[in-house]
C-alpha cells in the first residue's frame, strides 16, 4: 500500500465513519505499483445498508470530496454494489485492498 494511504489511516477511518462507510477498498494503480504523480486514486465503497437512497447519494459525494481533500488527488469512487461487469468485478475482487471495515 502506498505511503500516502498509510500516513493517513487515522483520518481515513474518521472520514469513513462520518460518511456511513461499511467497507472501503483501494484498487488500480495505487495497488499495482503503477501510481504516478498525476494518477488518480481508485476506491470502491460499500455504504451502510440503513441509508436511504437520498442519504446514500449525499454520503457518496461527501466521501469523494473528503478523500480528494485528504489525499490531494483526483479520486475515482465507485459503489461496489453496482459493479455489474463480471470481468471487472473479478479483477476488482482479486486486486482490491481493504482500507476500512466497520
Question: Where do the language-model regions lie?
Answer:
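Short hydrophobic/aromatic beta-strand micro-patches
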Residues: 44-46
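Catalytic core of pol beta-like nucleotidyltransferases
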Residues: 1-25, 31-33, 37, 50-102
Amino acid at each position: 500500500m502506498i505511503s500516502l494511504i498509510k500516513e493517513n489511516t487515522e483520518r481515513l477511518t474518521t472520514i469513513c465513519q462520518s460518511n456511513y462507510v461499511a467497507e472501503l477498498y483501494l484498487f488500480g494503480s495505487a495497488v499495482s505499483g503503477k501510481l504516478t504523480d498525476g494518477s488518480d486514486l481508485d476506491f470502491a465503497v460499500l455504504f451502510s445498508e440503513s441509508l436511504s437512497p437520498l442519504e446514500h447519494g449525499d454520503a457518496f459525494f461527501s466521501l469523494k470530496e473528503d478523500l480528494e481533500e485528504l489525499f490531494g488527488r483526483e479520486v475515482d469512487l465507485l459503489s461496489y454494489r453496482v459493479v455489474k461487469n463480471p470481468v471487472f468485478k473479478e479483477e476488482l475482487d482479486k486486486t482490491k485492498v481493504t482500507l476500512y471495515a466497520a
